[in-house]
From Swiss-Prot:
Pfam families: FA_synthesis (PF02504). It comes from Brucella canis (strain ATCC 23365 / NCTC 10854 / RM-666). Catalyzes the reversible formation of acyl-phosphate (acyl-PO(4)) from acyl-[acyl-carrier-protein] (acyl-ACP). This enzyme utilizes acyl-ACP as fatty acyl donor, but not acyl-CoA. One of its GO terms (cellular component) is cytoplasm. This is Phosphate acyltransferase. It is an enzyme of class 2 (transferase). GO terms for biological process: fatty acid biosynthetic process; phospholipid biosynthetic process. Keywords: Cytoplasm, Lipid biosynthesis, Lipid metabolism, Phospholipid biosynthesis, Phospholipid metabolism, Transferase. Homodimer. Probably interacts with PlsY. It is found in: Cytoplasm. Coiled coil: none annotated. Its EC number is 2.3.1.274. It catalyses: a fatty acyl-[ACP] + phosphate = an acyl phosphate + holo-[ACP]. One of its GO terms (molecular function) is phosphate:acyl-[acyl carrier protein] acyltransferase activity.
Amino acid sequence: MIKISIDAMGGDFGPEVVIPGAAKAFERHPDIRFIFFGLPAQVEPVLARYPKLKEASEFRASEVAIGMDDKPSQALRAGRGKSSMWQAIEAVKTGDADACVSAGNTGALMAMSKFCLRMMSDVERPAIAGIWPTLRGESIVLDIGATIGADARQLVDYAVMGAGMARALFEVRKPTVGLLNVGTEEVKGLDEIKEAGQILRDTPLDGLEYSGFVEGNDIGKGTVDVVVTEGFTGNIALKTAEGTARQMAELLRQAMSRTLLAKIGYVFAKGAFDRLREKMDPNKVNGGVFLGLSGIVIKSHGGANAEGFCSAVEVGYDMVRNRLLEKIEADLAHFHHSHSHVSSKA
C-alpha cells in the first residue's frame, strides 16, 4: 500500500479537478490510499461523488487555502500548520504519507516543502525535475523553476539526482546526462557550466554517463536521458515547449478544417493525428518532482485537468514504489566520496 497526501485546494480548479484526478489514479492503482486536506465545504461534496475513492481515503479539514498568487513569504505566514498545502507536506514528514501531490502555487509549495522537510545531506538547493516527451520516448529535465541560477556544485548535484530519477522511472541502468548550453564545444558557455562539465568528466560514476553539453534542440530529440540546467533557463524552455505544442495542435486543427478535401483527408488520418495530439498533450507528462528534499513532493500544473492531475499522482506513486529517495541519497553519497577522492589526488 502506498499512501499519498493531497492538497485538495491546489490549482486553478481545486477539488473539482483534484478529486476526479485522484479517482482516476485509484482506478489504475487500487493499492493507493489517499489523505485529502482541504476546506470541508468545498471538498466533502465532491468526494461524496466518488464513493469507492471516499471509502479508501481519509479527509482531514484545513482552515486555510493558499492562493495561486500568494507570495511564498505570505503563504508561510498565513498557512503554516493550518493550510491544506502545509498539512499535505507535513503528512510526509510525520510518516502518515509516502508522497505529497499539489497543484498549488509553485513558490509557496517549494518554500513550505523546504521549511517543513529537511534537505538531503550535502544538497544545497532543491530542483524541480520534469518528464519531457521526446522523439525517442521521454527524458528528464531539471531544474525547471525551483530557483534562479546555480553554481557548478549545484549543477552536478542536479545531474546525480536526475540520473537517479531516470533509473527509477525509465529502468535505465546508466542514464546519459547532458548539461544544457549554447553549444556543444567545451570552450562555450558560462564558467559554472564549464566547471560542472569538468567535474562530471573527471569523477568516475557508476550511476550515470556524462555525454557533454547539449543544446536546446537536443531536448526534444531525446539526445540524452537527463538534461541539466538552472531554474531560470529550464522554466523558459518548459513554457516554450508547452506553448509550441499547443500552437502545433491548433495549426493542425486549422489546416484540417480549411477545405472539404482537407476534412475528408482528416477522416482517414484521424487515428494518426489523435496519437500525435496525445503525444504532445502536456497533461500526459504532468508532474514535477521536487528533488533534493528528504521527502517526495510532486507539483502538478495549476491548470491541469483530471487526467493531468492523475498523471502527477502516478509520478508520485512510481517514485515511492521505486524507492527514489533511497537511491538518490546513495548516489549523492557515492558521488561526493568519489569527487573528494579525485580532488585530493589532483
